[in-house]
Amino acid sequence: MRYLKITLGIFILLIMNSCVKDKIIIPVIDDGGININELPYASLSEYDFFIGEIKLQNPTAGVFNYQPASSLFTDYAKKKRFIWMPEGSKANFVSDHELLDFPVGTILVKTFYYDHVLPSDETRIMETRLMIHKSSGWEFAEYVWNEDQTDAFLDMDGSYQEISWIQDTETKSSNYRIPSETECLICHKKSGEPIPIGLKPQNLNFDLQSGQNQLLELIQIGYLTDNLPSEINAVVDYNNPNENLDMRLRSYLDINCAHCHSENAHCDYRPMRLAFSETNNPVNMGLCVEPDEIIDAALINILTPGNINRSMMHFRLSSTDENTRMPLLGRTLVHEEGVQLLEEWINSKTDCN
């Protein structure tokens, strides 16, 4: 259980170009001239979300830069995430584990990029994804960046882009997949209708480097109604080895897998239920649960205590074959750190409890 801070500190406005968790907060909410019924635009620049060079992603007034506690793995791409709402609009708290209730007119923005791209050791933006909340529901808009990094253009058909970069001290390469509209819906759906994934209080309820709680900052700038409970169950940063191992794996599965392995989602026919709110019961994670699909007779359970070689989930997370990998979409590489976390958790278990 994580507790919301009830004392607000001095609110510092930072307009920065880095990706640290305590920027960028701009407390001016401005319509920006966006007519929601005209969207999506043909180019990203038409929205006026950013000031200066668009590739620098410095948000304009009314665009809030947020961070989840744990992030979805997408072939090691980095992300910048933003929220824009029409003037006077606010989101509402529903529950710890449910999406914030965003008003019509909300636009969610997510940019995917790499640093240290070869051969020139530069930053390269791959794509910017929008989810636009209209009266008819949420709509997708996918923008692919041009070679000069001067703008991104609407393209809902999907494509691949080869890229190589330095990850720490290692050279990595990916045939990076930019999703089609159909692929967006596979992950972003509930009962067949498009929905966002990460903007739940459980994912936002943590202190930024400034010491301010992120949910309280949303309230302070006028983007969230001040109706939060005093306690909110929250995920942790799964990369933090100082956090509880169970909490780390549950947080990892929630952000990487639960969008498909939940009721009325794409893989709801499978026995796993991987939302953070459900994995306090390890059976929902697949511990000592037989898989519904036999790939290899040795894989006797989804998760087998103390034995990664008999655990279906470990096999799927370690695979890059599109017929067997997990997640189904969003990666072509193995998330080595995620697999290591799963191995550590499996090896810590001695029985089915």
Residue map of PLM features:
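Sec-dependent signal peptide recognition
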Residues: 2-9
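C-terminal motif of bacterial Sec signal peptides marking the signal peptidase cleavage site
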Residues: 15-18
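Sequence context surrounding c-type heme c attachment/ligation sites in exported
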Residues: 20-29, 117-353
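Conserved small-residue
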Residues: 26-94, 113-115, 124-131, 137-155
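Short, surface-exposed secondary-structure edge patches
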Residues: 97-100
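Short, well-ordered loop/turn sites that connect or cap secondary structure elements
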Residues: 102-105
